[in-house]
Curated annotation (Swiss-Prot):
This is Dihydroorotase. Zn(2+) 2 binds at K103, H140, H178. Coiled coil: none annotated. Zn(2+) 1 binds at H17, H19, K103, D251. It catalyses: (S)-dihydroorotate + H2O = N-carbamoyl-L-aspartate + H(+). PROSITE patterns: DIHYDROOROTASE_1, DIHYDROOROTASE_2. One of its GO terms (biological process) is 'de novo' pyrimidine nucleobase biosynthetic process.
Length: 348
């Protein structure tokens, strides 16, 4: 029997879905991403969403100002789609290299999404322009109708929004972000070359029992919400198969402790400190480490038409405890897997 490897060396990965927030929170969380990843697709759902080229340029500079010396990191900016967004502004940002992609949030689907899209028809001229440009559309794939159960929102979105949209704009490049169901896994697997998906570490590692049985664990609460075990297993099977249109997107989403541990807590897991090691543990459990580098470092650039990073990252089999909390200016931040021991850690 071959002894398990003690070191995993992969091309420097990218994070194709991250929330860096703003202000003091941004300054705290950016180094956890910039230390490990060469690039990251930065979500635009700030309190004042990023809807213009100038706003994206200013936000990008605030991010770069928070990157520590010695970190080689490029934030890839996204435009927040609204019913009133100007297609010319979006095209200008894409041509000028400011916007890498645009993000569709259904109105009120998640944090800071009240400005989101009320219907696909409302933004059809913008989507048609994106199709012509070859600009990727990033989709939070949940319906928000009051009569749809929260555990059914993703599956319903496929039938009522995603599939009709892709039938209408067959050349539109779409990333179905943070997929959580067997329905989405099968839909992406059966889809064409221009449909891809990101998957978070928490949706590969946990299901809704982990969040709800024996007490509520607010730091596992995110949107889309954790689903049944059968859905978790479908995601694991998808990445273990070496499917090339699925790639790393942590959806790392920090909230201060008092906003998570309260009677109406916020959705989001701050997983940036432990995500890469968490993914490695999942791939190892599935005897799929042969596909780990592609998921982290190759599939995303291939879909986006970007070069692979030139640097390398090493993960070592060296147990490391995740801190219980991370200090903020006037609160603290509880990271994903706080207080737990992880098997794989990034070599500093």
């Amino acid at each position: 029997m071959t002894a398990p490897s003690q070191v995993l060396k992969i091309r420097r990965p990218d994070d194709w879905h991250v929330h860096l927030r703003d202000g003091d929170m941004l300054k705290t969380v950016v180094p956890y991403t910039s230390e490990i990843y060469g690039r990251a697709i930065v979500m635009p759902n700030l309190a004042s969403p990023i809807t213009t080229v100038d706003a994206a340029i200013a936000y990008r500079q605030r991010i770069l100002d928070a990157v520590p010396a010695g970190h080689d990191f490029t934030p890839l900016m996204t435009c927040y789609l609204t019913d009133s967004l100007d297609a010319d502004e979006l095209e200008r940002g894409f041509h000028e290299g400011v916007f890498t992609a645009a993000k569709l949030y259904p109105a009120n689907a998640t944090t800071n999404s009240s400005h989101g899209v009320t219907s696909v028809d409302a933004i059809m001229p913008v989507l048609e322009r994106m199709e012509k440009l070859g600009m990727p559309l990033l989709v939070h794939g949940e319906v928000t109708h009051a009569d749809v159960d929260i555990f059914d929102r993703e599956a319903r979105f496929i039938d009522t929004v995603m599939e009709p949209l892709r039938q209408r704009l067959t050349a539109l490049k779409v990333v179905f972000e943070h997929i959580t169901t067997k329905d989405a896994a099968q839909y992406v697997r059966d889809g064409s070359y221009n449909l891809a998906a990101t998957i978070t570490p928490q949706h590969l590692m946990f299901n809704r029992n982990d969040m709800l049985v024996g007490g509520i664990r607010p730091h596992l609460y995110c949107l889309p919400i954790l689903k049944r075990n059968i859905h978790q297993q479908a995601l694991r099977d998808l990445v273990a198969s070496g499917f090339t249109r699925a790639f790393l997107g942590t959806d790392s989403a920090p909230h201060s402790r008092h906003r998570k541990e309260t009677r109406c807590g916020c959705a989001g897991c701050f997983n940036a400190p432990s995500a890469l090691g968490s993914y490695a543990a999942v791939f190892e459990e599935m005897n799929a480490l042969a596909h780990f580098e592609a998921f982290c470092s190759l599939n995303g650039p291939q879909f986006y038409g970007l070069p692979v990073n030139t640097g390398w990252v090493e993960l070592v089999r060296d147990e490391q405890q995740i801190p219980e909390n991370i200090a903020l200016a006037d609160d603290s931040l509880v990271p994903f897997l706080a207080g737990e021991t992880v098997r794989w850690s990034v070599k500093k």
